[in-house]
Amino acid sequence: MKALKVPEATITRLSVYSRFLERMDRNGIVTVSSGEIAEGVGVSSAQVRKDLAYFGEFGTRGVGYNVKDLMHYTSKILGLNEPWPIVLAGAGNLGFALCTYKGFNDRGFTIVGVFDNDLTKIGKKIVDLEVYPPERMPEVIAKHKVRIGIIAVPARAAQEVADQMVKNGLQAILNFAPVVLNVPDHVLLRNVDLSVSLEVLTFNLVQKESQAG
């Protein structure tokens, strides 16, 4: 089956649509129009229709979309129709926040192992997860058939952690460390740098002020 070439922005919006549809379903809404989705998530109705068109034909002209059906389809497209076990490297403040974030479980993502090389953290628990030394990562990955890893360690340790994850068969990495990682082409890598996001905001604020002044 040929892989779809879909813009990343479309995938991001699809995730937002999926959450919106879940809220509609919880509120007992049966059908929804592209205009209502657009208003609910802050895009145009044309954008909603264009995004969905990448994946097929949905809904009925003049009627709209069945909420449960579209919710099912978007979840399936995003791969959320199956559980996703995850390993997390880093038991510091960020690691703790990630472990206690309920949104992961709500979307089918479950952290099954937390690892740190800090002897003061090893053996302690975050919620119901014991912090393991890095040497136990292969065991946990194999046991739970893990394909995704999260890196929440200092920049100086991130590449070594990424190498260990790749060596043990992980196929995708979400990296919170503020450093460029080198991984093989077959490994999916997504970087999340909170400082960069803040700098984008400060840039736009400065531009807005200069235009106003």
Curated annotation (Swiss-Prot):
- Give the species: Pelotomaculum thermopropionicum (strain DSM 13744 / JCM 10971 / SI)
Entry's transmembrane regions? none
What are the annotated GO cellular component locations? cytoplasm
Which keywords does this chain's UniProt record carry?
Cytoplasm, DNA-binding, NAD, Repressor, Transcription, Transcription regulation
User: What is the name listed in the Swiss-Prot or TrEMBL entry for this protein?
Assistant: Redox-sensing transcriptional repressor Rex
Keyword check for Cytoplasm: yes
Principal localisation: cytoplasm
PANTHER family this protein is in?
A: REDOX-SENSING TRANSCRIPTIONAL REPRESSOR REX, REDOX-SENSING TRANSCRIPTIONAL REPRESSOR REX 1
State the protein's purpose: Modulates transcription in response to changes in cellular NADH/NAD(+) redox state.
Q: Where in the cell is it found?
A: Cytoplasm
**Listed GO biological process terms:** negative regulation of DNA-templated transcription; response to redox state
Q: Which InterPro entries match?
A: CoA-bd, NAD(P)-bd_dom_sf, Rex_DNA-bd_C_dom, Tscrpt_rep_Rex, WH-like_DNA-bd_sf, WH_DNA-bd_sf
Q: Gene symbol? A: rex
Per the record, DNA-binding region residues lie at 16-55
Binding residue positions for NAD(+): G90, A91, G92, N93, L94, G95
Q: A single GO molecular function, which one?
A: DNA binding
Which domain of life, per UniProt?
A: Bacteria
